[in-house]
Each structure stands twice: as structure tokens, then as C-alpha cells.
Amino acid sequence: LMGNVQSGKTSHMFGLIAAAADQGFNIFVLLTTDNTLLQEQTFKRALADLDTFCVCGENDYIRFQANALRKPVLLVLKKNVHVLQQWKNNFSSTNFCAGNPLFIVDDEADAASPNTKVNQKDVSAINRTLNAIKKTSSSSIYLQVTGTPQSLLLQTKIAGWKPQFIYYFA
């Protein structure tokens, strides 16, 4: 999903999340940059716009577990390796993800998510952890959202991060 700055990408993300919930998806992860203010802003907006969801922040594991998928859950997480590793462990330790597809929305997908160590024949920590999170469920959808898609479009197909299709709006 590609759009200009301040073009309504967040509204489109929330609309897609709501539509996917209507189709039976129960677990959503919305990744923000590693900026606390942006993560909190997105979290507050999700609380307001997705009021039929159990919206959780990075420290809301008890709320996530208590919900027990009675309502669709949206986790708003920073792209921070420690936060992502903790939630990967949380997913692995519960049965919620085992039989349910995982819908991941990566806001600013060109920041931190692609493997930044590909030229060193290594895998960056965030990229490795995101791959591990995807593997905690039976299947996953990974939606990349950006206003600057160049690094995503230049990914190799074997990297597994190159978009299969692009939806652009202005």
C-alpha cells in the first residue's frame, strides 16, 4: 500500500484491518517505527477508530491473553527488536496463533523491516524477528505500507520481502 505523505494511509490501514476482521481474521499486528510518540499516536487512533477490537500496546500481554480472541485483537508495536522478540515469545507460548492466520501491517515498511545486512551475508535482527513472528501462525499476510517504496521495490524475490503487488492512492 503506497501513498503520499498525509494522504490517508492510516485510515486505509484501519479500513483493511476492519474488513479482514469481517472475513475471520482475529490477530493483527500493526508495526510502527521505533518512535515512542508515533507508536502512542497510532495506538490512540486505533483505540478510537477500531472500538470493537481489543487494542493492545507493547506492554499489554495480560489484556491480549484475557481477551482470548473473543474480539479481534490489534497489537500496535514499535519496530524494536526487544519488543518484537517479546511478542514472538508471547505468540509462541499461547495457542492463539497456532490455528489462526496472522495479519501484519507494517507502517513505514521501508524503515527497519528489510534485511539491512544482506550485503554482509547476514540477517538484521528486526528482519530475523519479523520472519520468526510470521512463522508463529499457520499462515500470515504481510501488508507493507509506505510513502517511499524504493527500498521495497529493489528487494530480490528470494528475500521474501519484495511486494507481490502495489496499490497506490494519492
Language-model features: locations:
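Catalytic P-loop NTPase motifs of RecA-like helicase/translocase cores
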Residues: G8, A112-N115, L152
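Conserved P-loop NTPase catalytic core
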Residues: R70, N100-P101, D106, V118-A170
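P-loop (Walker A) phosphate-binding loop of NTP-binding proteins
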Residues: N4-V5, T33
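Short, surface-exposed basic-aromatic patches at helix termini and helix-loop junctions that form
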Residues: A18-Q23, R45-D51, N90-A98, N131-S137, ...
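Hydrophobic anchor at the beta1->P-loop junction of P-loop NTPases
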Residues: L1
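Motif I (Walker A/P-loop) of helicase-class P-loop NTPases
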Residues: T10-A18
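Conserved RecA-like ASCE ATPase "motif II neighborhood" in helicase/translocase motors
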Residues: G57-E108, A112-I133
